[in-house]
Amino acid sequence: MTKLDAQRVLIVGGSRDIGLAVAQAVTEAGATAIIGARDQLRAAEAAKNVTGAEAVYMNITDEDSIVSGLEKCGRVDHIVVTTSAHHNAEVTDLDHEKTQAAFEAKIIGPLMLAKHAASILPSTGSIVLFSGVAAWNPDPGYSIMAITNGAVSFAAAHLAKELAPIRVNALSPGVIDSGSWDVMGEDAKQEFLSGAAESTLVNRYGQNSDITDGVLWLLTAGFISGETIHIEGGARFN
């Protein structure tokens, strides 16, 4: 038996990339993965490829959708939130709606999810939010990504205090070959990943397994709460 046997884990944003990898990992650890996504067809298709997984419609930017999605989930023991909406632009070129969408996906939505999940999670339950290395590496053109990721880290600490004994933590990935970079084309992707590897202290970029190992640990580490776990090969120091 593992610590996740018979547990039910909701992964919001679980229909692709890192979220889907998390769904597969918790299943292999003995849990039932509940794949939450705003694209119902993609969520259902993803669930078919993960043994025993369930799919539920959940739009993290719509509070009513969060409420109805949680109701359809039934029992939930842990929640992992991987959602994001990027708006990479210099401050002088920021778009109000895109900026708001980034905060909705990364901060406001997860806060609303915590609001409604607090009453259904068991005292031994947990929430894992996703921050990101950009928060610790100021870079022109990426301020919204950095600010929202930094806010996630602070949100984890404050939610851990308020929702205790439910544990809340954040995981901060670096550049991960998760599938999200495939749209660049193979040559451009490899050039990008090579550059990312050089920016770390361990001379490599991340794999999905690096992240899923961290998530599994946070889901089962009963004495860890309010923390941000950095999984980026020391990139924030380089």
Language-model region placement:
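Substrate-binding pocket helix/loop in short-chain dehydrogenase/reductase
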Residues: E90-V91, K98-F103, F192, A196
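N-terminal Rossmann NAD(P)H-binding glycine-rich loop of SDR-like oxidoreductase domains
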Residues: S15, A23
